[in-house]
């Protein structure tokens, strides 16, 4: 067996794990997993993420708005429409305000999953504004960010260079030599 594993990016709160979530999570310590950072991608899954974080002492949470959450409801796939569109009408700033109380929870250790994803047909200006707001929030809260960078490396890099937040880049679609 290798050394201990800390999974820096998980979505066990996703519906894909409904059938076996508890059994799977219960088994992780026996497989060498010493920690998991469970990601909320919008206000709709934040309560489920925190429920897991409070159930398991080795699970912590990251709370944020994923750029894909800005997709129109018809494009959201099996998870259904994100509250960013279905509840807040695309007003991510209002959703960020609704998320603020979660950051007081000691199990919330990061802002994320946040970033840019130019694969999906989400307006670039909205993504940039949201990501910049989440970076500034992370700096204000003195928390790291969990960055999603899909086909948007130049813009992600520019914002990270401008603000220099602590964090992890989890989805990275750039060429190796540019990393």
Where are these regions (language model features)?
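Histidine-centered catalytic micro-motifs
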Residues: 5-14, 146-152, 168-173
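Nucleotide and nucleotide-moiety/phosphate-recognizing core
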Residues: 137-139, 156-161
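Active-site gating/metal-coordination segments in enzymes
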Residues: 1-19, 48-144
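Conserved small/polar residues in nucleotide/adenosyl-binding loops
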Residues: 177-178
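Metal-associated gating/positioning segment near the N- to mid-region
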Residues: 11-48
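Active-site-proximal loop/turn and secondary-structure-junction residues that shape catalytic pockets
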Residues: 42, 65-69, 115-117, 151-153, ...
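A cross-family glycoside hydrolase active-site/sugar-binding cleft signature
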Residues: 39, 62-64, 112, 146-148, ...
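Short active-site oxyanion
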Residues: 33-36, 142-145, 165-168
